[in-house]
């Protein structure tokens, strides 16, 4: 629900990056919803460029391309302003699981790197956008509890003054802790025909004190799994008479994620072809948008984006 979404970009890229990299990152950011760019950095003293690259008319590499780049970005974000995202998938932001794991004590990892070992929401988001070409929206669990969201005919509906979005699938990233009130809303979504895909680790503890048994009961009612016991080694599924479906994938990969989404949302509102399915010369397609294939990051490094 952000009409303007800003992002600082290009900071700490190689000093000798070419002008085409300006466009590559711009396209990646726009595909992810950014419509306000803050290029880094425009140094007043070209002899004191502490963090490359220099993005200004003084740069011999980038300076000649900046006027066309500025026109391109200006036109593109003008088209994106005021638009409405159309996507079938909501991805729950696992803030309660991240917060429950973190501790302020000597010996713990640096701030931003202290994440639970099962943490996978950044991996899921990278696969969805960069490789599976499935658009999605992060949903904050506290907002999900309120009146911004409602459930109608198997859809989770976000309806505000700025936008309206209707989700048919809610993905739960791995995590042991969740708000009981959030899980109640998720159960309502399932009971009214919604589709749920859980990955890696089901919640077993409540973000609120003294309500763990409610979490256990709700997870059992949705997935038919007791989360206090070891997670099932194989994929499990559940369904109800209202059309609700829930799938738990214990060891999620790109392929198991793609397959599960196809089962739960067989006819998406928008379908973007996979690179492998596009009928074009291989050398014209380039690589996937995602960072994980070319730059494998540890869970700790991925946690820096939390």
What are these regions (language model features)?
Residues 1-306:
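Carbohydrate-binding surfaces of carbohydrate-active enzymes
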């Amino acid at each position: 629900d952000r009409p303007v979404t800003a992002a600082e970009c290009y900071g700490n890229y190689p000093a000798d990056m070419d002008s085409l990299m300006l466009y590559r990152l711009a396209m990646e950011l726009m595909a992810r919803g950014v419509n306000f760019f803050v290029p880094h950095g425009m140094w007043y003293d070209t002899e004191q460029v502490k963090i490359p690259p220099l993005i200004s008319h003084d740069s011999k590499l980038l300076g000649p391309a900046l006027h066309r780049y500025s026109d391109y970005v200006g036109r593109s974000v003008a088209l994106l302003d005021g638009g409405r995202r159309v996507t079938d998938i909501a991805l729950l932001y696992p803030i309660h699981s991240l917060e429950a794991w973190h501790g302020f004590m000597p010996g713990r990892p640096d701030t931003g790197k202290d994440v639970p070992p099962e943490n996978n929401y950044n991996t899921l988001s990278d696969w969805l956008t960069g490789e599976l070409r499935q658009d999605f929206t992060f949903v904050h669990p506290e907002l999900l509890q309120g009146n911004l969201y409602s459930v109608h005919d198997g859809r989770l509906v976000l309806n505000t003054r700025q936008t309206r979005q209707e989700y048919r699938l809610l993905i739960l990233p791995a995590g042991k802790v969740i708000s009981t009130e959030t899980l109640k809303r998720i159960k309502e979504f399932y009971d009214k025909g919604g589709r749920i895909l859980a990955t890696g680790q089901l919640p077993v503890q409540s973000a609120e004190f003294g309500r763990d048994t409610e979490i256990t009961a709700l997870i059992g009612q949705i997935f038919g799994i007791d989360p206090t016991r070891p997670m099932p080694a194989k994929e499990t599924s559940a369904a109800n008479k209202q059309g609700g479906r829930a799938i738990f994938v214990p060891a999620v990969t790109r392929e198991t994620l793609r397959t599960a989404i196809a089962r739960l949302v067989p006819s998406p509102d928008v379908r973007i072809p996979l690179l492998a399915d596009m009928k074009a010369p291989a050398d014209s397609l380039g690589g996937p948008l995602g960072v994980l294939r070319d730059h494998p990051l540890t869970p700790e490094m991925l946690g820096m984006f939390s």
